[in-house]
């Protein structure tokens, strides 16, 4: 199956405690069907002190399931489904089904 969510995409969270929030995808883990989104699903982690880094409690992003994310429409920022289209020059690109705008390229 082709990747509907890619690194660098702006996505909207559909369910959970961060519902409605949007952020940029930092990393996609296709085997686990999860993604890391900047500023979304933050958890507190206890960090041990090292020579390079100070110890303490830090906030970091936790992975969120891809089924709880939707790509943001480039036109208005609302969640949209993703389709694929082949252009005249033969490139396969993603487009927003909500507005018809191209997501990449």
UniProtKB/Swiss-Prot annotation:
Enumerate the NCBIfam families for this protein.
rplX_bact
- Keyword match Ribosomal protein: yes
Among CDD domains, the record links this protein to: KOW_RPL26
Reported function = One of two assembly initiator proteins, it binds directly to the 5'-end of the 23S rRNA, where it nucleates assembly of the 50S subunit. One of the proteins that surrounds the polypeptide exit tunnel on the outside of the subunit.
Q: Which GO terms describe its molecular function?
A: rRNA binding; structural constituent of ribosome
Recorded hits in SMART domains, A to Z, give:
KOW (SM00739)
Q: Which gene encodes it?
A: rplX
Q: Return the similarity comment.
A: Belongs to the universal ribosomal protein uL24 family.
Q: What is this protein called?
A: Large ribosomal subunit protein uL24
Species of provenance:
Methylobacterium nodulans (strain LMG 21967 / CNCM I-2342 / ORS 2060)
A GO cellular component term found in this entry reads:
ribosome
């Amino acid at each position: 199956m082709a990747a509907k969510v890619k690194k660098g995409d702006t996505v909207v969270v559909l369910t959970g405690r961060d519902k409605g929030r949007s952020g940029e995808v930092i990393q996609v883990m296709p085997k686990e069907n999860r993604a890391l989104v900047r500023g979304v699903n933050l958890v507190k982690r206890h960090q041990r002190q090292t020579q390079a880094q100070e110890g303490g409690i830090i906030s970091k992003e936790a992975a969120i399931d891809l089924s709880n994310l939707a790509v943001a429409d480039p036109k208005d920022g609302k969640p949209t489904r993703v389709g694929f289209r082949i252009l005249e020059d033969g490139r396969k690109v993603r487009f927003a089904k909500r507005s018809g705008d191209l997501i990449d390229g």
